[in-house]
Amino acid sequence: LVVSGVPPQQAALVAKSTPIALDEPLPLPKFQNRDDVVAAIIRALDGIDSGFVEALIRREILASGIIKTWNEILVPALVTIGKRWEESGSGIEVEHLFSEIVKRIMRDCTNEIESPRNPKPVLLASIGEEHHCLAIHALAAALAEENIATHFLGARTPVDALAEMVRKTHPPVVFLWAQLTKNADYSAITSLPALRPAPRLILGGPGWQAAKAQGATMVDNLH
């Protein structure tokens, strides 16, 4: 509810009035092994058949949605490409090609939102010198599937620019991505302007360390 822009007080009242089983954990999404699809994508990328790759990913999104496509197909493909580069030093052109295809698709999915249910968009950014931003492209698209609008600042967002954007837009949630430990700029936690209500700060990616992220919520999956 808060992500959607509902004021925290109202969200709390709704939550209190909604019966839930406190002893039952929230169900985790079930993901399938899609090694066959991943292998098909890798073969097509090796053949520089970007049309096939793009059509396949778009078909999977239509059939299963962003979250399942990201976790079952796109992440495994990225891991495969990354491992091959680490082992052989080759394939960087494949990684760049694949990344641009995924970005284009996710942008298209994000642009399809017409009637957002949140009056103030969620703010997404890769912090500091972090140039990896595929995950937040996917997050923006996944939120768009739920009619949740976002402001996307992209890669290498300076902390002062982030703070100014928060001041101007009053987002209900700020999501910051750090793929690498060296790019996790913890000053972002204390540098955001004091707003009422305060935006919820969520840190995503393996670059963040929980011990240094007091005052923020950490997530390690796009679920």
Short names for language-model regions:
Residues 88-223:
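C-terminal regulatory/effector modules of DNA-binding transcriptional regulators
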